[in-house]
Amino acid sequence: MNKKLLITALLALVAMTDWAQEIKTNETTINVYIPMLNQKGYQAYSFDVSAIKGKNVTFNVREFVDGKEVKDSPRLLFPYYFQANGDKLVYGFLPSENDSTALCYFNWENTLRSSWSLKLKQLYWESENKYVYSYRSDPFEPTSPLEKDTFIPLVYYASFWYDAENKVTRCCGTISDIIKRSPHYYILGIKFY
């Protein structure tokens, strides 16, 4: 009798371990979509701009080639100031319809939203023996305290470069490393008055 009871108990345990190995679906949240959107060219960076709410602001773009600022840079995205009415600013990049431009987007909460294009420069990709457009973006860590009438960099958009020493095309490292090595980049930011 004890053998039958023991065998029955073991079979029940084996059956229960099979039940424990089922796969269940999880609720899909926005965090599931973010890596997929990034892979398709959507990038977004959100900033708390509550410290300058109510101030007059301009959006600025600075372009650099081989470490030197381009002659007509910096430039305003709009030819006027506007009053910042919101606490949040989102800068982002959207998939472009062609390789030679990047489509940028910004949205200042309760204030203004727009998009514009940045012209890109080709990079010779030695490993592929061809010219390509290859860029990446990342946010700056905003500095404190914020100063009036001073450019505040928020996001950089930098091209990859060929690293001859390691025989690889790359765009990695700290922001200061990338800015030293990238042959072409933009810095997007704001000024307040």
Go through the PLM ranges and name each one:
Residues 37-42, 52-54, 183:
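Short, surface-exposed loop/turn motifs at beta-strand boundaries within globular domains
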Residues 53-127:
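Structured domain cores in non-transmembrane regions
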Residues 45, 59, 186-188:
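Hydrophobic residues positioned within well-ordered beta-strands of beta-sheet architectures
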Residues 104-193:
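Extracytoplasmic electrostatic interaction patches
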Residues 1-25:
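Bacterial Sec-dependent N-terminal signal peptides
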Residues 46-50:
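Short edge beta-strand/loop segments characteristic of extracellular beta-sandwich folds
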Residues 22-36:
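Short N-terminal segments immediately surrounding and downstream of signal-peptide cleavage
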